[in-house]
């Protein structure tokens, strides 16, 4: 089962894990309404596809005002997002997640994924955040805790 970032954050909120305020959007119009609802000076506009590397591929942008938010929403929604995990064919962005800006004290990476070599699920946690988790895995694997 694959879930999007916004779905994972909904699960976190149900279990009282602090997460930034965010709103999923399935159309450009919904995304613009979400921006207005967040009432935050800074908003992250995030493509929701089942692949990592969204930021490096241009699918995550920070908007510092309404004009920037509108530009990013219109550019990202419907784009064919190509990342190191999608391959050359990429994936069409059909949903966005808008998240209000916050001051980050600490950031963690968590994932439940399939370990194909062991043919079982693995729960992974790291204090190194998730922006370049593949780099962390290859250069400092001891910073990722795995539980099978």
Task: Give the residues covered by each predicted segment.
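A conserved helix-loop-beta module that forms one wall/lid of the active-site cleft
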Residues: 1-37, 41-42
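Catalytic cores of large soluble enzymes that bind and process phosphate-bearing ligands
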Residues: 3-4, 23-26, 61-68, 90, ...
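ATP-grasp fold ATP-binding core
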Residues: 5-8, 12, 39-54, 83-104, ...
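Gly-rich Lys/Arg/Thr-decorated short loops/hinges at beta-loop-alpha junctions or inter-strand turns
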Residues: 11-15, 54-55, 142-145
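Structural signal for hydrophobic packing residues in well-ordered secondary-structure cores
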Residues: 16, 35-39, 73-84, 117-118
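Glycine-rich phosphate-binding loop of ATP-grasp-fold ATP-dependent ligases
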Residues: 20-22, 45-74, 109, 132-133
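Non-catalytic terminal accessory/regulatory regions of metabolic enzymes
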Residues: 29, 38, 68, 76-82, ...
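Hydrophobic alpha-helical hairpins/lids featuring a short glycine-rich hinge
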Residues: 83-148
């Amino acid at each position: 089962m694959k879930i999007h970032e916004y779905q994972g954050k909904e699960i976190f909120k149900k279990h009282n894990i602090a997460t930034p305020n965010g709103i999923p959007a399935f159309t450009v119009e919904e995304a613009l309404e979400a921006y207005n609802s967040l009432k935050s000076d800074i908003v992250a506009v995030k493509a929701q596809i089942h692949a990592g590397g969204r930021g490096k591929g241009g699918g995550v942008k920070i908007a510092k005002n309404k004009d920037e938010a509108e530009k990013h929403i219109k550019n990202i929604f419907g784009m064919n997002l190509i990342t190191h995990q999608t391959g050359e064919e990429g994936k069409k962005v059909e949903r966005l997640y808008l998240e209000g800006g916050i001051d980050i004290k600490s950031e963690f990476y968590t994932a439940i994924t399939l370990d194909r070599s062991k043919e079982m699920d693995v729960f992974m946690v790291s204090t190194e955040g998730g922006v370049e988790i593949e780099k962390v895995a290859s250069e400092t694997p001891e910073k990722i805790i795995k539980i099978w």
